[in-house]
Regions:
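N-terminal interaction/assembly modules
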Residues: 1-135
Length: 135
């Protein structure tokens, strides 16, 4: 697995923990990396994604809500909600990652961690957000 893909996976796991446990960011980071042998570049990118996504939730969540027809954020599967958050953060703030790569990486996470419909769900919402932001 490529380093950036692994970083996204780690960031998703931390976002999931933050969403479920409602624990502080510093505690999640400390507990997550404890006893993990991870290359520094993987860890640094994962932390950047995690911290950046959390910092921008006030702008990310309403954006997702506007494009998730008939879906309330609270009713979404926790994993799908956090894949969307991560994907939107990358779409909007990762200037070195092409939008198609951001969307594809999020869809792959959905296929790996979500249910059989997650990939299509994630793809549809992220694609709509991307098209709207570049219209």
């Amino acid at each position: 697995m490529r380093n950036r893909t692994k970083s996204r996976e780690y960031a998703l796991q931390m976002l999931y923990q933050a969403d479920i446990r409602r624990t502080g960011q510093a505690q999640i980071l400390e507990e997550f990396w404890q006893d993990q042998e991870t290359p520094e570049d993987v860890k640094a990118f994962a932390n950047q994604l995690f911290e950046g996504t959390l910092a921008r939730l006030p702008e990310i969540d309403p954006l997702i809500s506007r494009h998730a027809d008939n879906w309330d954020m609270k009713r979404m599967a926790v994993i799908d909600r956090n894949i969307l958050r991560l994907g939107v953060f990358e779409l909007m703030h990762a200037e070195d990652v092409p939008p198609k790569v951001c969307i594809n990486e999020a869809v792959e996470l959905a296929k790996r961690f979500g249910d059989e419909e997650s990939g299509k769900f994630i793809n549809g919402i992220l694609d709509a957000i991307h098209k709207k932001s570049h219209a």
